[in-house]
């Protein structure tokens, strides 16, 4: 797509997180792949990054397939994994063993994709968002670690140290990074949410536990405390941008019948 002066309008795909609610997102992304719809950039938060990378590797159906296959494997996601390793979603099994051995992620196709791929994490020492682009020289292990950092939910995940930073779930600091994508040049965007349009985020009920687990990181605690305010403000911004005609928002009509974690392969 071009403007009258032949300046290309860059298109972006913005994927919210939501753990296994991201399966809704991937149903839509699979359709985009199958219909060969191209975006210049994709930015994913948490599950949006973990699942959205398959848009670049052109592997429709892969996310649903491996989630169904490993839904009852304690190494993938379980209380047992959390108690034994500190991670609800197994760091080694889910983020390395599955994509590199059991249900291979097509890293070569990912690397040659013309679509830029960005992951959002939260720096626990500053409480601010970190936006990491998948550079050409990045190895599959490094990519998987950045994705793991983006998807590492507080309380049920260990802090991920990478790139000289201590990182956790990107949704804490920038749940719907449309504004960031616009600022770096993606003018026309499709945003896929995992909550219905009438959703209003409430303050977390886990702050007492957060204060205990993250007591060394006051800026992270502040971000967690105000996360609902940030999120609801982003929803208002989405509405404004949608009215301007440069943003298309796709969201479920009603609350999805799936929790953050699920062991039901159906």
Model-derived segments and their meaning:
Residues 1-45, 53-266:
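Patatin-like phospholipase
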């Amino acid at each position: 797509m071009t403007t009258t002066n032949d300046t290309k309008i860059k298109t972006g795909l913005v994927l919210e997180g939501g753990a296994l609610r991201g399966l809704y997102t991937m149903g839509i992304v699979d359709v985009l792949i199958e219909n060969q719809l191209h975006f210049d950039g994709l930015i994913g938060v948490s599950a949006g990054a973990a699942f959205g990378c398959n848009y670049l590797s052109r592997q429709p159906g892969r996310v649903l397939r491996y989630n169904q296959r490993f839904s009852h494997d304690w190494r993938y996601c379980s209380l047992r994994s959390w108690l034994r390793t500190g991670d609800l979603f197994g760091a080694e099994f889910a983020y390395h063993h599955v994509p590199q051995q059991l249900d291979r992620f097509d890293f070569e196709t990912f690397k040659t994709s013309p679509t830029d791929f960005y992951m959002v994490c939260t720096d626990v020492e500053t409480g601010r968002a970190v936006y990491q682009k998948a550079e050409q020289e990045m190895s599959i292990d490094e990519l998987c670690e950045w994705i793991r950092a983006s998807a590492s939910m507080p309380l049920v995940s260990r802090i991920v140290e990478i790139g000289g930073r201590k990182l956790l779930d990107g949704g804490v600091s920038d749940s719907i990074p449309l504004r960031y994508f616009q600022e770096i040049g993606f003018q026309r965007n499709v945003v896929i949410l995992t909550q219905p349009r009438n959703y209003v985020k409430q303050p977390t009920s886990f702050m007492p536990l957060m204060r205990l687990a993250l007591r060394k990181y006051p800026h992270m605690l502040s971000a967690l405390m105000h996360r609902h305010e940030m999120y609801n403000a982003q929803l208002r911004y989405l509405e404004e941008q949608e009215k301007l005609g440069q943003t298309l928002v796709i969201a479920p009509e009603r609350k999805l019948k799936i929790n953050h974690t699920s062991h039901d392969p159906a």
